[in-house]
């Protein structure tokens, strides 16, 4: 697809040859024709990088016949839809910060980094609606970050310019959550590097890491802010499998050189982080896969203990010892196995027919795993690359049991509107500020991200230890909002590092169904507690409210609480269906 540029604020004296010469002088040669109008012109570039270079080099900077010319993408009003391009992003800006900024103005479907030779970064962003894209352009144009000012343009929305029937888009992989195998699946390599080597990997003014990313066509995120004071820092590498392996090899060489020069360490092992759900398949039956990799590459491979895992740290550390060449070869084989496991799991997830409408498991982003949510510059034009791997996304069995009566699909608007639910979540009083954020920024962003209403109820007294957060929204919104709140409390150290975040949640159920939740002799509630690991309390002597509802208390970690909430809602739904089937109180006959 050609990148058509608009050249504005031209003097009437300007000719097509003037423009050709000016572009040529700036080493921006025009291959196609110049379409000259009165006061403006259009030119085409087949490559997006050249188009970006022309905009950055000329717009507002070059005078032609006494007038400063303007250069931008030419996007007709009918094509000004959901896609925008943001340029002049600081090279050192953490991707997580940019993600949060974009989410303030709407639901981001896709963010694609554009590989350019400019010092600053460029991303193409697709919002869910054209209104959100318009708002983002209005609010972010000229947004100052340190000494950098964002430059934003509309770019053509391929789905608008060449519309196709919904079923074709689904088959071809357009839209979030699609499982098309035609596109490159992004499964990043995560490694741990000693903190003392981080500076060497980045290099003076970021030159070393820029060289790595340029040579390997990769994006390398060094999560320096994670685990302050820790001996090791996670690094995430997004690229093709070949690019990932080459970037990993270069990082190993830099670390070994630094270790030799500083004599800080004799050996620098390669430490790969992998989600626990994949490790069994990497090891293989009786350890055969791992032994084969060790034998073929001449390395020694060990894997961290299961005891180091928690719900907030689902990754195991795979330590590879050997020469740089041997470790690099082992990385290739290890990642082959991990990618295969990931792709199989994602295929299973996408085939699930038992999930929430429109639930994009990979994009939930409910816990801070150190992964950027920006996809890599992979995937054909117009097809968003697969979302980054989220550790909890592969638990297809967990999700299918959690949401047994909902259907997954990339087009949520094709389904009936999901039922609204209200949950009261109790958080430590001292955490209220962190949840609200500066001038309410965090809670607003969270509400937009989750698609829920989130309010913090007034304190019942001056010395209360907990405050109630009222969340209203459909099941997926509840999952996202509650998950982010659990994660935020962990991130902000309101709980000890080795302590799981356990919160109390209240849901209201019709008083007529409370007995069914308890079960005969407490059998149902006991089974529920055993199944979910949550504490479930249904007070027997509770007086129903004006809506004839009573409160069920649920106490536990995030997954435990979510499972209990879903199962209780399921019981309530079953009772409702029975009441609709037998409205006159005629109970179904039971066979003895």
Swiss-Prot record:
GO MF terms, alphabetically ordered: mRNA 3'-UTR binding; mRNA 5'-UTR binding; N6-methyladenosine-containing RNA reader activity; translation regulator activity
Subcellular location: Nucleus; Cytoplasm; Cytoplasm, P-body; Cytoplasm, Stress granule
Region spans: Disordered: 157-182
Superkingdom to which the source organism belongs: Eukaryota
Pfam families: KH_1, RRM_1
GO biological process: cold-induced thermogenesis; CRD-mediated mRNA stabilization; energy homeostasis; mRNA transport; negative regulation of translation
Domain (KH): residue spans on this chain: 186-251, 267-334, 420-485, 502-568
Location of Phosphoserine modifications: 11, 162, 164
UniProt note on tissues of expression: Expressed in oocytes, granulosa cells of small and growing follicles and Leydig cells of the testis (at protein level). Expressed in testis and ovary.
Record key words, sorted: Cytoplasm, mRNA transport, Nucleus, Phosphoprotein, Repeat, RNA-binding, Translation regulation, Transport
Gene3D superfamilies tied to this protein: 3.30.310.210, 3.30.70.330, K Homology domain, type 1
CDD domains: KH-I_IGF2BP2_rpt1 (cd22491), KH-I_IGF2BP2_rpt3 (cd22497), KH-I_IGF2BP2_rpt4 (cd22500), RRM1_IGF2BP2 (cd12626), RRM2_IGF2BP2 (cd12629)
Similarity remark: Belongs to the RRM IMP/VICKZ family.
UniProt-recorded name of the protein: Insulin-like growth factor 2 mRNA-binding protein 2
